């Protein structure tokens, strides 16, 4: 593993100015192209979320603590997608010179906008008091625990650190900073509450998982990787920030979950990310929530049952009978693990 020297003038091949960046074909990175097609096939819109029964659960089935917890989680999510998009639009889209990756980033921006719209719609639906609603919509300024997470992510946008470091940082945002909140909402699904919220959580967590996978894939294209010590420090910082948010400032105890188990789950997610980046585990923590594995399997099954017809309709999943072998890399295969 060749390590990064910040004083070096070396430029990664995927960041070098590329005169062919405006033309897509021929595909030079088929694995990145497949990832883009995979993202394209999972497209959805906020109007698909049925919130019809959520208000009843919100008013009559949730406790004050549960409402407080959910509203603050939604406030963080509503701001975080905008932060991710800020980075994509102002840094990554212009830095990365390969068109296949730009296709993915362009679509990711659209999906993050849908996420942001969905979270804003959820807050708009559940929160009736205007003052409370305004506070949640401005959470990165008004709520300290959310402000701290936002500042961690924002500093990487304007930072002069290497592309590799910033790529890993935003993989940590999507792979670690979202993990505790996603898990807590799945806990509500396990209890049969808030069907609209939990369905949107399924869709969004799937999307963010794919975005994180893409960051890891792009990292493999870098010739000079980060020193393991740099990776460990970044990941530990992100883990501590997420633990403080979901186990202390906004404790999952409020919704009946165990903070110690949640802390372990965050470490498990961090280890999964580190391994995907090509490094050794840091925490060696197992998944304390077996039901999260079951939800993942159910999500994959239900997703395909409901969406395959739509793929065929748009031609995304269709492989022509006469397609040549060298074009097969551009076909979405529906046995991929979402």
Curated annotation (Swiss-Prot):
One of its GO terms (biological process) is sorocarp morphogenesis. The keyword Metal-binding applies. InterPro entries: Ferritin-like_SF, RNR-like, RNR_small, RNR_small_AS, RNR_small_fam. It catalyses: a 2'-deoxyribonucleoside 5'-diphosphate + [thioredoxin]-disulfide + H2O = a ribonucleoside 5'-diphosphate + [thioredoxin]-dithiol. Gene3D superfamilies: Ribonucleotide Reductase, subunit A (1.10.620.20). Keywords: Cytoplasm, Deoxyribonucleotide synthesis, Iron, Metal-binding, Oxidoreductase. Its EC number is 1.17.4.1. Binds 2 iron ions per subunit. Its cofactor is Fe cation. Fe cation 2 binds at residues 112, 174, 208, 211. One of its GO terms (cellular component) is ribonucleoside-diphosphate reductase complex. CDD domains: RNRR2. Belongs to the ribonucleoside diphosphate reductase small chain family. This is Ribonucleoside-diphosphate reductase small subunit. It comes from Dictyostelium discoideum.
């Amino acid at each position: 593993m060749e390590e990064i020297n910040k004083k070096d003038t070396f430029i990664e091949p995927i960041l070098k100015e590329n005169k062919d960046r405006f033309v897509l074909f021929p595909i030079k990175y088929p694995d990145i192209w497949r990832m883009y097609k995979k993202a394209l096939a999972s497209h959805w819109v906020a109007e698909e979320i049925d919130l019809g029964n959520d208000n009843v659960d919100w008013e009559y089935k949730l406790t004050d603590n549960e409402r407080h917890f959910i509203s603050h989680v939604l406030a963080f999510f509503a701001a975080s997608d905008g932060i991710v998009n800020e980075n994509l639009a102002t840094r990554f889209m212009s830095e990365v010179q390969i068109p296949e990756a730009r296709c993915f980033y362009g679509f990711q921006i659209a999906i993050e906008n849908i996420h942001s719209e969905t979270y804003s719609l959820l807050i708009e639906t559940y929160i009736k008091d205007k003052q409370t609603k305004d506070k949640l919509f401005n959470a990165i300024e008004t709520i300290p625990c959310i402000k701290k997470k936002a500042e961690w992510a924002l500093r990487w946008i304007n930072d002069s650190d290497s592309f590799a470091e910033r790529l890993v940082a935003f993989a940590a945002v999507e792979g670690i900073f979202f993990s505790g909140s996603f898990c807590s909402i799945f806990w509500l699904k396990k209890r049969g509450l808030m069907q609209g919220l939990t369905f949107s959580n399924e869709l969004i967590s799937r999307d963010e998982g794919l975005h994180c996978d893409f960051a890891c894939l792009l990292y493999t294209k870098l010739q000079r990787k980060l020193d393991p010590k740099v990776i460990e420090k970044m990941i530990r910082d992100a883990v501590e920030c997420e633990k403080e948010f979901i186990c202390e400032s906004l404790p999952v105890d409020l919704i009946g979950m165990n903070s110690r188990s949640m802390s372990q789950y965050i470490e498990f997610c961090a280890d999964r990310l580190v391994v995907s980046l090509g490094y050794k585990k840091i925490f060696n923590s197992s998944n304390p929530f077996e039901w999260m594995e079951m939800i993942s399997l159910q999500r994959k099954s239900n997703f395909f049952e409901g969406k395959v017809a739509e793929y065929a309709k748009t031609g995304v999943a269709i492989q022509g009978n006469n397609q040549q072998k060298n074009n097969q890399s551009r076909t979405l295969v529906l046995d991929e693990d979402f």
